[in-house]
């Protein structure tokens, strides 16, 4: 009897072994059939180890979390110690000491950032660990999915592209990186051809794909994702620097819920001197206004965690830096292939994931630096329109809320969005929720900062100085430039009137160029009781941009405790000690709403 039981157990064991091994033999055979020919910069034989690694990882990984799942400290302590000892230009994220000769426009012309400075900084430079201190002690799942890291580029600078790759290789556990896929969007610079292929041949995990024509950022990302082999696809831009232990916190969240899209905190690499620092406000939720400009808003108290280093929900991603389960990405349809070049794709993927059964989080313990260009250095092909992309997203995903966009951008109303039938069918097939659900359940805090229907303005029109008879003017007003006084031009031509001397004292208690329905995105800003009044990005956080229009016609600035003043001789506008009897501190708005002003001044 015992002999029969033993034979029975052996038979069961063999059957179980066959169930485990045979599917993986089939997977290996399928891989061998689909393996592309080796070519310079291509996949070739170098990918075989990654494929074997993927095979083994699929044998041992199921990602059904249970009590047996162990946690691990993924920090590379030795690499962190080495980085701490590095000195030199740009090390520890410090600014490069620029000379006047290095600030010339030629340094920025090809890349939108100072390539001269970039070339003088090490490809392996160290970065400051600016994570919350709690991140140092966080543990993540011992068994994590691996990832294909997709980096699209078009005519990228040599050192900035290579530094992106080096930072990923230096600060990522190698067992978690299935591959790094560089996708060249039809670059024509010589250093991105054979020199790049020769250089990247030194790194077996890196391969290069090339488009046959200019496809744009969106389709180039799609090409990279379609060629990816990892469990997860992680998208980065081509001028980034990954910071310490950036990857495990992202993959951990996906391992726990495969329908979660995760975004690192995006730090700022200065386009001039390459200093590395956090964004203003650091951890904030992604949002948008009703002209479809990306915005960041504070995390509301209801969503704040006891541990500020924990992941938090975000309605909208910033753009090109995120990780997503590869299969889930394709279940969602990837990016809409009808979107051209760049722009609007972050809204499309954000709305789609939330409305169609997934979620999106920002991960404070994962940080990646990004160079925000001084300007876009390349030309967009003729006929390509950001407005068309935004209209396409609005038509497919935003339901009746699209009307709020058209009210602010009436030119969008009759713009063709192309054929959206397939995208609307996809939305139905995925059983996606309504945009009203998104606005009430996910982005419920957005209307507090960017209401679909703007509350009435407190004042608008020209702002005329009583003492000089001159008007505030933005004729020379680029971002960061001082506000000026000029001869008032009301009635001297509608185009000039609309563009230079119309201002709105908004319901946010800031002052912006433009009429109440078409305000611009920069505000009157002052930093001290003697500083000039400058035009700065509106942040809707009051502070330096909070103003009070008092009954004595002064524009009072609570932060500095001073009033807006001016000089007729040099046309300057500046802050000064308040003196209600001074005519140069008295200002007349063309139109005022007394009810709104009274409410402002009560507060």
Swiss-Prot record:
Residues on Cytoplasmic side: 1-11
Protein task: Catalyzes the initial reaction in O-linked oligosaccharide biosynthesis, the transfer of an N-acetyl-D-galactosamine residue to a serine or threonine residue on the protein receptor. Has activity toward Muc5Ac and EA2 peptide substrates.
Enzyme Commission number, as recorded: 2.4.1.41
Domain Ricin B-type lectin: 458-590
Positions of the UniProt region annotated as Flexible loop: 373-384
Enzyme class of the recorded protein, top EC level: transferase
This protein's pathway: Protein modification; protein glycosylation
Membrane topology: Single-pass type II membrane protein
Protein name stated in the entry: Polypeptide N-acetylgalactosaminyltransferase 10
CC cofactor: Mn(2+)
Family: Belongs to the glycosyltransferase 2 family. GalNAc-T subfamily.
Gene3D superfamilies for the chain: 2.80.10.50, Spore Coat Polysaccharide Biosynthesis Protein SpsA, Chain A
Coiled coil: none
